[in-house]
Amino acid sequence: MLYDTSSLMKCQVKKYSGLNFARKIRPVAPDISSKIWYCGTSIGLTYDGLIASANFCKNRFCPTCQWRRSVKLFKQNYDCFEWIKAQYPGCRFVFLTLTVRNVPIDSLASRLSDMSNAWHRFTMRRDFKHLGLLGWLRVLEVTRNAITGTYHPHFHVVFVVPSGCWLPDHSWWLRCWQLAARDESIMFVNLRVVDGSKSSIEEVSKYVVKDSDFSGSAWVPEFTQLYSALSNVRCFSPAGCWRAARRALGFVDPDKDTLTDDVSTGG
């Protein structure tokens, strides 16, 4: 019997990106560079191509581990969508992107802390609670503008809306986020209904940083500050029925995941 090696081939592609990334950061972060360099050097496959064992480094900046997290999060989020729809017939899913102004690397850590506090104020508002939402999934993403060299942290959120529930319009969400963030200069939030399709699930299955944002080398002197800013930051936060779905389905926190496949269930 021949092995299905498609997963191994995809890991190999990401491994090349990881080696390039490790070379770049070696002068400023040799320990992290070493972990990423040796990540995924030993991978065990089942006959049907599932990754049964591997020495993944699990670092947030490792291209291989980023890819594995995204693959697993996509499947888990799809299963959560299906579980929630079965438990709450007629519910809707609303996708919201909450942005803040770009900041230089020196201000990123404080901006992330401010965003966490703003989110707490946002969800504690009396008018927000009156919406009667069933739960949500909030994901943090941080991108880098290659032209300005600034960083753009933002939240992707999927809200689960009960059947027949009225939701306010775009201007209400923008105003509430401005007040929660205590920043009147915020001029944009993105609000739309999603259906659990592949494209909508992919949007909330990203991980905190993308290796494509680090194709050049201008960011290298900033890496230690970036790494420190994202340390101990909660990037994946389910609540309500979404947390219940993950618990019922036996999913673990993405940062604690081994990044191998669950060979007992075939995925």
Residue positions per predicted region:
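Cys/His-coordinated zinc-finger cores
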Residues: V157
